[in-house]
Amino acid sequence: MKYKTDDLRISGLQEVIPPDELHREFPITDAASDTVYMARKAIHEILQGESDRLLVIVGPCSIHDTKAGREYANLLKPLMAELADELCIVMRIYFEKPRTTVGWKGLINDPHLDDSFNINHGLRQARSLLLDIADMGIPAGTEYLDLISPQYISDLVSWGAIGARTTESQGHRELASGLSCPVGFKNATDGGLKVAVDAIQAASRPHVFMSLTKQGHSAIFSTTGNKDCHMILRGGKTPNYDAANVAQATQQLESSGQNTHLMIDCSHANSEKDHTRQIQVCSDVAGQIKAGNHNIMGVMLESHLVAGRQNVENKDELIYGQSITDACIAWDETEALLRKLAQAVKARREA
């Protein structure tokens, strides 16, 4: 007797649009490519110590409403121009959410917020939003969680993150080694730094692995390695944004021969999951910068139009501009923090 041994737990199968088809639907424009190219160049210069500007990744924890995302971008644009001498501002545009157990996995996976999982529509929404925002002159930063989705959107992404749960993943290190943008690796959820140090080292080297082409075919990819990778301190069992922890992380990076420039995530475990504490964390980091710390090259903030968060109980009754994942600070608080960071950079220059 021949037993069935494959697909025993697969309940459905639906074809997804090939990446090159989505690229034809939403082709990158000259203006968008200029935004991405110049932002990547600016971030490279910050990472290599050629620029003393501060990289700031700021925006909603996740995008669930593209209209609100576009409104946020419109608020951010004039501030980007005003603070451009001190800050390189990149809008946080996260479409994929890692879950500790289960939950909404992001706009690409479930754009309608109703477990219909219309991924084709989610991919279209994601690329359309990235294209519009890049056309406005605003660079985007995103987390790379799924290993296939970068083929759909990575040409429109100026900075990428690998999250705490995936930093140790070989597949994500290989992906980062071939991405065209700078990439930040978060420390482990328990606060351990070694996994991020190892990830930076691994991603800087060439790799050969299997993946999918833009035509949707399996292929063997060879990468050159990504020298624009850095650590993101996001806290662990305790916060790790303070000067002592920054010094420890810098020393560990230096000992392993890695770039000592690092970013501090003001949210997550550093804020102890209290969005209002981002203000305190960011103020502390600004103080370190003001005091002359040149190893802090970036800051990450979770910010939205409206403070706090909400559950998706009835999607027709959602508060416009408020997060449905992690709680965020409001726009007015964000604006004040960005100005504080810019002043800290000015003070560091004068020190």
Regions found by a protein language model. Name each.
Residues K2-D7, A73, E86-Y241, N245-V246, ...:
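Active-site-facing alpha/beta catalytic cores
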Residues L8-L47:
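N- or domain-start disorder-to-order transition segments that initiate the globular core
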Residues P19-P27, T223-G235, L318:
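Gly-rich Lys/Arg/Thr-decorated short loops/hinges at beta-loop-alpha junctions or inter-strand turns
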Residues L47-E50, M80-A84, L130-G137, S222-T223, ...:
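Acidic (Asp/Glu)-rich catalytic clusters
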Residues L55-A68, D326:
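Conserved phosphate/anionic-ligand binding catalytic regions in large, soluble enzymes, centered on
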Residues G59, I264, A330:
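Conserved, mostly hydrophobic/aromatic
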Residues H304-A347:
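Internal helix-turn-beta structural module
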